[in-house]
Amino acid sequence: MTKVLHLSHHYGCLKDHQYVCDKLGLDLTNKLSIWNDIIKRDVYCITREIANSTWKEHKDYFNSFDFIITSDTAPLSRIFLENIDEFKGQLIVWVCNRFNYEMHDDDAYLTLMSESVGKDNVKIIPYTKFETMWAEAYKVKFTEEVIRPIGVSIDKPLSENEDLGLIGFGGDYGDELKGGDLLVSRYHNDTLWQDSVKMMEHYDLSADPCKYRGYKGLVELAKKYEAYFILPEQYSKFAAFELMNIGLPVILPSEDFLFHLSSANNYWFGSGLYKNTTEVCEWYNEYYDQFALYIDDFEEIPETFKIVKEHKKKIRGIMKKCAKEHQSKTLDQWRKIYNV
């Protein structure tokens, strides 16, 4: 069985790819930085010294795998790129949060990434089109096609020693939520830029902040609500694909309205939103174009919610079709990468 090691700072990346590896019949080992196992917690700037010392300490272990994949953040790949001539396996760099996160001033790293593109045992794979656009701004040209999150996970620990309390899942994650009309994103724009829950109450709609423990928690929570509302703050979110798979209708600003909102004081959007990049945000991808309910003004929310109520079965049917298509395509993409 093909052996795969996945290193990441991001629990969601590990869970998403765990599903992929399970479906493809791969023998997967996960390492999350918060466990302080191989990679250290909160160490995002991977210098050449850190990369080489980590490689030296774990070289034999690393070479026991057929594939090693790194995800959020991409600089973890430096451990292997600096020592690629000694690495016996295949390296996959799944770029999930800007390839140069915390590495902007390290010219040697930028050169290393650029020179690694196209190597026989290296595949640098963006998880959304914006990652390619961002890299090109730094004269790094990715050649692999985008492979997006599949948006599903399995109810299985990442590791025998997994402790969800260590990654924040022991805190306030919505166990008390009874249900209502709308689940609202719990991130900056819906809580600090404005209070979207209160806005829904102004429109006589019941709403709660979307708090849950992983994919399974979202599946259960979604059963209690009619729709989900978000003011986007990233080009891609695992939640965008999870909501599609679960079949919870999504209400959000149109591209033009989002661009207008993004210019407001204190509205946050990761890496900035520009007129020519709004369209590559995954909340407006070819799937969401078929089922999302876009608004051009907050005043449209009550009528839009009414449409959800009246046509929920049809909307969910479209979401189910899109989810099936997306899962099939994504698994085929990874199947080619792993040659299985």
Annotate each predicted stretch with a short phrase.
Residues 150-218:
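Conserved catalytic-core segment of nucleotide-activated headgroup transferases in glycan assembly
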Residues 232-233, 237-325:
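Catalytic binding pocket for nucleotide-activated donors in carbohydrate/polymer assembly enzymes
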Residues 6-12, 32-35, 69-75, 94-99, ...:
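Structural motif
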Residues 228-229:
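A short hydrophobic beta-strand element within the catalytic core of glycosyltransferases
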Residues 214-225, 245:
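Short acidic alpha-helix that forms the nucleotide-activated donor recognition element
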Residues 304-307, 324-340:
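C-terminal alpha-helical cap of glycosyltransferases
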Residues 1-86, 332-340:
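N-terminal pre-catalytic "stem/leader" segment of glycosyltransferase-like enzymes
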Residues 73-178:
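Catalytic core of nucleotide-activated saccharide and alditol-phosphate transferases
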